[in-house]
Amino acid sequence: GAWKTPVLFHSASRNPITFMTEDTFKTVQRRKDKGKHYLCGGTSFNVGVEAQYEQLELELPGVLPDMEKWVAKSREQLANAVYADVGEIEGHILVLFDAHVDKLLTVRAVRLTPSLEISTEEEDWSQYIHMPYAANQEIEPQKNNESDEEELVELL
């Protein structure tokens, strides 16, 4: 099903930014139908990125040709999420994080290849995690209500 997710836009680099846990990302990477996931639409903006050497050895499934319509739809949704007046989108950045109970353990920003491999463009931001912070807040999932005028975008 569809999820609502925040999409930020870094105007200096002209990149939309999305967020995901490390575990969810690993699951999406290995899906045979991953072309339906919004990440593939995001990575379609990442032209000319190269996978890290260790990522090449994973032999991840590629995006099947029959999934291209989903990739195009996700790409359009991401572009619309940051509004059309931003101009040309230069790429997509995924912020991956790992948390345990109430502690944020790691955070990194990555640029992905079209087959969802981590590219050579990666930054570890874990050094910026400082205590105290409140990570134990309970948040109720939002209902998908199309009449809401919120700053979230529904991505497939």
Range-by-range predicted roles:
Residues 2-54:
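Aromatic- and glycine-enriched beta-alpha-beta binding-site module
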Residues 7, 57-58, 154:
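Intrinsically disordered, low-complexity segments enriched in glycine/proline and serine/threonine
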